[in-house]
């Protein structure tokens, strides 16, 4: 008998009038809000404004969420594509299924294109968001706890996760290995959502600490490379603890391969930027100049609008 364990929530949604609110969505939204706050705080230190971050967020986040959903559906096709799945299930995001690797890939691409369009230095934008991303991911992982999903192998450790939903066993009662899972009522499972939360928060703290400690030595973009290395390394071992179904390629789960690629790309990016990366101070001066131009244009537009309104009143 297990005397100590982590209990699972007894609910994953609630009703407000005719609307159903899913805790999974709330966790993601809170994570996004906290990440935007961290990003904006760091961005303003480089000479930017909150409005710049707000505009970038409104463009990037929806695309990142679509990328996260599509990556999940593509890497677990049995539930979403014929002959075993239903395409309509792709739209059922409230049931869970958002893969961060897809979100990172699409979100990074869209953010790069937007920064290029607005003439913002992307390298320091990437550095500004580097610790914000793992914090957002840590908060979002609580959604997996509410959904009772993405847990790990059975364990007897005192921090094992106790499930209270029969359907929570991989949502199919079949373990990833193909064997029948133990009885959820008497078995504890590794809380991989918690492992990743802790890993991400440690990573965010390290990025902030090293970014401050090595401020005179780091090139612009290297803090983002740290994030890629840290998260790729963490997902490599955490993914191997999970028992949810995943496509296997050459003996490794798809997400393990992706995590390895992300880690390697982070290492390469860190080394390349160390040799050839831009100077953060020069990038900050460039951002300050762009910001000054934006504020001047806004001031001119506001003055023109004020004069136009005043003219209309006198007619």
Curated annotation (Swiss-Prot):
One of its GO terms (cellular component) is plasma membrane. Its main location: membrane. Its EC number is 2.5.1.145. InterPro entries: Lgt. It holds the Pfam family LGT. One of its GO terms (molecular function) is phosphatidylglycerol-prolipoprotein diacylglyceryl transferase activity. It is an enzyme of class 2 (transferase). GO terms for biological process: lipoprotein biosynthetic process. The chain crosses the membrane at residues 19-39, 93-113, 188-208, 256-276. A 1,2-diacyl-sn-glycero-3-phospho-(1'-sn-glycerol) binds at residue 141. Keywords: Cell membrane, Membrane, Transferase, Transmembrane, Transmembrane helix. It is a multi-pass membrane protein. It comes from the Bacteria. It is found in: Cell membrane. Pathway: Protein modification; lipoprotein biosynthesis (diacylglyceryl transfer). HAMAP family: Lgt. Belongs to the Lgt family. Catalyzes the transfer of the diacylglyceryl group from phosphatidylglycerol to the sulfhydryl group of the N-terminal cysteine of a prolipoprotein, the first step in the formation of mature lipoproteins. This is Phosphatidylglycerol--prolipoprotein diacylglyceryl transferase.
């Amino acid at each position: 008998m297990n005397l100590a364990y982590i209990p699972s929530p007894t609910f994953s949604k609630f009703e407000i009038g005719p609307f159903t609110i899913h805790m999974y969505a709330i966790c993601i939204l809170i994570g996004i809000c906290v990440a935007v706050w961290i990003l904006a705080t760091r961005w303003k230190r480089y000479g930017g404004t909150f409005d710049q971050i707000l505009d970038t967020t409104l463009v990037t986040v929806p695309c990142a969420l679509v990328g996260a959903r599509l990556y999940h559906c593509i890497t677990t096709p049995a539930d979403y594509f014929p002959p075993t799945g239903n395409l309509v299930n792709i739209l059922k995001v409230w049931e869970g299924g958002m893969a961060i690797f897809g979100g990172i890939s699409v979100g990074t691409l869209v953010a790069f294109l937007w920064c290029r369009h607005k003439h913002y230095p992307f390298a320091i934008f990437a550095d500004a968001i580097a610790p914000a991303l793992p914090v957002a991911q840590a908060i979002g992982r609580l959604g997996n706890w509410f959904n009772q999903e993405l847990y790990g192998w059975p364990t007897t450790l005192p921090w094992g996760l106790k499930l209270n939903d029969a359907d929570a066993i991989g949502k199919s009662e079949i373990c990833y290995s193909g064997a029948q899972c133990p009885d959820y009522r008497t078995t504890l499972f590794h809380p991989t959502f918690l492992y990743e939360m802790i890993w991400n928060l440690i990573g965010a703290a390290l990025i902030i600490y090293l970014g401050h400690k090595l401020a005179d030595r780091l090139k612009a973009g290297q803090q983002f490379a740290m994030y890629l290395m840290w998260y790729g390394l963490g997902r490599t071992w955490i993914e191997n603890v999970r028992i949810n179904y995943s496509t296997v390629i050459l003996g490794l789960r798809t997400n393990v391969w992706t995590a390895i690629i992300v880690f390697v790309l982070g290492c390469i990016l860190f080394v390349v930027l160390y040799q050839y990366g831009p100077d953060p101070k020069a990038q900050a001066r460039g951002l300050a100049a762009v910001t000054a131009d934006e504020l001047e244009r806004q001031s001119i537009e506001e003055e023109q609008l004020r004069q136009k309104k005043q003219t209309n009143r006198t007619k």
